[in-house]
Amino acid sequence: MKENIHPPYKQIKVTCSCGNTFMTGSTLDRELHLEICSACHPFYTGQQKMVDTAGRVERFRKKYAKRRAANASPEDEKK
C-alpha cells in the first residue's frame, strides 16, 4: 500500500432515528445519522411497520413543483 495517499480511518459514532447508537470505522470526520438501522429495520426485527417515506415524497414534490408550474399549459388548467 502506498504511503500518505489514503484518508485516515477512525472510529465514528452512528446514531439512528430510533435512538440506537454504535461505533464503526469510517473515513468521515463527523458523526453519522441514519433513518433506519438493524435495531429498527423490519427485516431484522421481524415486525411489520410502516417506514416513513413522506419526507422523500415531499422533497420530490417541492423540487419539481416549479418545473410543473412553468410547463403547465392553459389546456392542462381546464381539465
From Swiss-Prot:
Cofactor-binding details, from the entry: Binds 1 zinc ion per subunit.
InterPro entries, A to Z: Ribosomal_bL28/bL31-like_sf (IPR034704), Ribosomal_bL31 (IPR002150), Ribosomal_bL31_A (IPR027491), Ribosomal_bL31_sf (IPR042105)
Keyword GTP-binding set for record: no
The entry's keywords: Metal-binding, Ribonucleoprotein, Ribosomal protein, RNA-binding, rRNA-binding, Zinc
One Pfam family recorded for the sequence: Ribosomal_L31
Function text: Binds the 23S rRNA.
The protein's assembly and partners: Part of the 50S ribosomal subunit.
Family listed: Belongs to the bacterial ribosomal protein bL31 family. Type A subfamily.
UniProt protein name: Large ribosomal subunit protein bL31
Organism: Coxiella burnetii (strain RSA 493 / Nine Mile phase I)
